[in-house]
């Protein structure tokens, strides 16, 4: 039987683009692990993606996951849009390159053999784990230490 894991995620950006961070909480039974990091220049969507990626990449075996995010971009991207992006060689319906393709590809790879249920939660609405992830993300964004090498400012 697969382990049942809960993951909660959030991303934050102080300015968009600007310094950003992500926060994630992973819970298995009574065990809990948190993840966060801050980047000097990035976007809120990239940080939302990173939160999910880092938590999923930390799983050491195939799991049944409920992943909660307040990002419609992440939830819709992974449950709806990604299938056509892949069919079109990572291009949008308008034949433009998919934004944040480096992270979408990394998230796609991180899904692995996991069975994942994507849940959307309303942000800043008192959801305890989402609020904690928001705090982790904002604290990381306030003290960025990393460069988001995949971030490509729009020209």
Curated annotation (Swiss-Prot):
The entry's protein name is: Ribonuclease H
Fetch the NCBIfam families from UniProt.
PRK00203.1
Q: Please state where this protein is localized.
A: Cytoplasm
- Main localization, broad class: cytoplasm
What does the UniProt function comment say about this protein? Endonuclease that specifically degrades the RNA of RNA-DNA hybrids.
Q: How is the cofactor bound?
A: Binds 1 Mg(2+) ion per subunit. May bind a second metal ion at a regulatory site, or after substrate binding.
> Which residues does Mg(2+) 2 bind?
10, 134
Q: Which GO terms describe its biological process?
A: DNA replication, removal of RNA primer
* Residues of the RNase H type-1 domain: 1-142
> What's its EC?
3.1.26.4
Q: Which cofactor does it need?
A: Mg(2+)
What broad class of enzyme is this? hydrolase
- SUPFAM superfamilies for the chain: Ribonuclease H-like (SSF53098)
Q: How does it assemble?
A: Monomer.
